[in-house]
Amino acid sequence: MLALWFRAKFKVDAVGWLWRAAARRCCLLGLSFFVAPFSLAQRLELTWPTPNRAWEQGRGIAAWAQPTVSGDPESGLFGCVRSAGGQFHEGLDIKPVGRDARGEPTDKIFAALPGVVRYISTKPRESNYGRYIVIEHPGVTPAVFTLYAHLAKIEPGIGVGSNVQLGQVIATMGHSAGGGGIPAERAHLHFEIGLMATTGFSSWYTWKKFGSTNEHGLWNGMNLMGLDPLDFLRQWRERRVDNFQQYFANMRSVVRVRVVTSRTPDFIRRYPALLRKPLPLGFVSGWEIECNATGLPFAWTPLGPAEVAGLRSESVHIQSVEAASVRAYRCKSLVKQRGSSYGPGGDLQTMLQLIFGLR
């Protein structure tokens, strides 16, 4: 099992001062969170979520990535990897290393990080994920979730609220999915790492009038925003980053957008590590948000009155666009060009609707 340790050294006086300052600030703001000041220096211990050791051994993706019917291993990765770049895939598909006499996968699935089970979907036909588990990781900054999908069965003793340890067996690999399932020969684990958009998901879902019941509450896939697990794992293995906070801090900005609002979304209250500067003591007047190529809002800057002067409340303004990356990620619609300027595209609009409650 892959597990690397890193011991960070801190100056006690400086750490104590930062803790006291953070605590004072949280009391002033009346907020229930603060960020551990040493979190940028801590190195995560994590594990690959299946018995397939190919990635740990440095072998190519064909040794572990389960392709679609196309047969292309790239189609099992994260990003615009399907339908000639026109379809987004929000995770990694990991093939099995063991099968029984019937050809069914026997691989056990491991918790990639210590955490708390937040959701288990036990009715495979109700989601494209099939049977899936979501684990939140409160000990990580920010508190990302990991998702494990297309499972055959859940391990006995694993339930919502269960605390799981690093590498603990949580399930068995399968090929469950809505809409008829996945052929046994293409059984795999679909693995995601990401952030939850909003605790107000039910309001957005009702407003959208999809015509079907939300069977999965907050852990509906539409409320989950993934990062590229392989990119993070590569950077972690190469020691370019030690943890998720460093990874988000180094993320590439593709679209920068301003939202004129006095709201502080629950998203940034849950993930305060994404703040680029402290919240003001009073109300905010707006937000400047940096998004990566898939629309993940990874950097947040609160704005004061002077920075949104003359702008209509609840309005959205594109500040900058890295056009080459937008073109490369054509499976995502982050912006639409309007002459010499840009407006929000469909995927960016959805993210802002979810997080800010814009309607």
Describe each region flagged by the PLM.
Residues E104-T106, A112-E155, I182-A184, H188:
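Zn2+-dependent peptidoglycan hydrolase active-site motif and core
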Residues R25-P37:
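Bacterial N-terminal signal peptides
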Residues M1-A21:
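N-terminal secretory signal peptides that target proteins for export/translocation
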Residues A112, I158, N163-V164:
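Short, well-ordered loop/turn sites that connect or cap secondary structure elements
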Residues P96-G98, G139, K153, F191, ...:
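Non-catalytic surface loops within mature trypsin-like serine protease
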Residues K95-G98, T146-E155, H175-G180, F210-H216:
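Short helix/strand-bridging catalytic loops that position acidic/His residues to coordinate divalent metals
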Residues S127, Y132-I135, S162-R240:
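Conserved, short, structured surface segments that act as functional micro-motifs
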Residues A41-R131, E215-L358:
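Surface-exposed, glycine-biased beta-strand/turn segments
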